């Protein structure tokens, strides 16, 4: 990812290859130019070409068997319940009451808890205990909630409904909503830094803090959001798939990526394992957004628990708008396959939650 965002008119979009996801190059470019380079999503293998085909087929069959026999709904309900209890404990109702009420209103409003579950599953995949990841998974959910509060504000998406309830600023006012988001953002880092078990080395905690900070700044969420805002009303002839990918690799995938990477770091994963988790999460992050865009034009507000069709009304750039509905569905299937490819070679039992999570994101209905 690049360290800055340049004006929309100066983008140069490179060709898209089916086996890559495009992200920004770290090399210095002229101020008016953003270059993109492909990152291969295919995990490195050490097997010979003569045996690779049979090995891949065997591994893929093992993954499919593991995924199909795994009760993901029971898993996610159980993990989400433990996350909800931890969040309730981490952010108690105290003085000043109004700000803590506003923080808790959005933080404890339910939701799928996909990011904390991803953090847990990644931690366990590399051999860590679930308890080690508790502060990290709470931190990513606090930051995710902050992003929702701010995203719903009149100056952003101007939304009235979130998770089936009035948005934070509709209940507490814009001023308190902004402060509630700010408070959740700062407390997320405090919680990650101070509540992580002493079993985790200080070096790994510092690394986790750095990853989380990067994911939400101008190399992550903020970059995606500002380009998204600037893209409203753009002529489709002037943008392409890579442009839309940039937005959502930063705005949506970055925090999912951080969730998986934090789990891998806290769980004691190797650099190779952490990078494979990063690429897996990057794929499901894009997948999440593609499906979200599809649902926005195919489901009602009641079914979604939030305002349906808002992107169409706001003239936002979306995958169905750029590619059409059927091509968007095909792209979602491709991303799910690429995500699964990153998990080849891991223990089939430990990898089951991540496989099921990818399928859940691909097939969700709200």
Curated annotation (Swiss-Prot):
EC no. given is 2.5.1.-, 2.5.1.1, 2.5.1.29, 2.5.1.10
Q: Which residues bind dimethylallyl diphosphate?
A: 162, 251-252, 289, 306, 316
Listed InterPro entries: Isoprenoid_synthase_dom_sf, Polyprenyl_synt, Polyprenyl_synt_CS, Prenyl_diphosphate_synthase
Tell me one GO biological process term. Answer: farnesyl diphosphate biosynthetic process
Write down the top EC class of this protein. Answer: transferase
Q: How does it assemble?
A: Dimer.
Q: What is this protein called?
A: Geranylgeranyl pyrophosphate synthase, chloroplastic/chromoplastic
Q: Which organism is it from?
A: Sinapis alba (White mustard)
Q: Its encoding gene is what?
A: GGPS1
């Amino acid at each position: 990812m690049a360290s800055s965002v340049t004006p929309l008119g100066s983008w140069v979009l490179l060709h898209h290859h089916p086996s890559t996801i495009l992200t920004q190059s770290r090399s210095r470019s002229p101020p008016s130019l953003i270059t993109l380079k492909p990152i291969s999503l295919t995990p490195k293998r050490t097997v010979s070409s003569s045996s690779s085909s049979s090995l891949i087929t065997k591994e893929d069959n093992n993954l499919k068997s593991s995924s199909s026999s795994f009760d993901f709904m029971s898993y996610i309900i159980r993990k989400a319940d433990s996350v909800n209890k931890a969040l309730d404990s981490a952010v108690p109702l105290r003085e000043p009451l109004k700000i803590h009420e506003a923080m808790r209103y959005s933080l404890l409003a339910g939701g799928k808890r996909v990011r904390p579950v991803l953090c847990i599953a990644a931690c366990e995949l590399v051999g860590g205990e679930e308890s080690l990841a508790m502060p990290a998974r709470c931190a990513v959910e606090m930051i995710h909630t902050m992003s929702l509060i701010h995203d719903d504000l009149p100056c952003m998406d101007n939304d009235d409904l979130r998770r089936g309830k009035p948005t934070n600023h509709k209940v507490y006012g814009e001023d308190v909503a902004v402060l509630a988001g700010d408070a959740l953002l700062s407390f997320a880092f405090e919680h990650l830094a101070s509540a992580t078990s002493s079993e985790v080395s200080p070096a790994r905690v510092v690394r986790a803090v750095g990853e989380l900070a990067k994911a939400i700044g101008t190399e992550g969420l903020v970059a995606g959001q500002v380009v998204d805002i600037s893209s409203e009303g753009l002529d489709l002839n002037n943008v392409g798939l890579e442009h839309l990918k940039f937005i959502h690799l930063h705005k949506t995938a970055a925090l999912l990526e951080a969730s998986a990477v934090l789990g891998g770091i806290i769980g004691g994963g190797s650099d190779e394992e952490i990078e494979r988790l990063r690429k897996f999460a990057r794929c499901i992050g894009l997948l999440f957004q593609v499906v979200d865009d599809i649902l926005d034009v195919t489901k009602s507000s009641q079914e979604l628990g939030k305002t349906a069709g808002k992107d169409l009304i706001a003239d936002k750039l979306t995958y169905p708008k750029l590619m059409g509905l059927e091509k968007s569905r095909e792209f979602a299937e491709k991303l799910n396959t690429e995500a699964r490819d990153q998990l080849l070679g891991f223990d089939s039992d430990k990898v089951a939650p991540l496989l099921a999570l990818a399928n859940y994101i691909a097939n969700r209905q709200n």
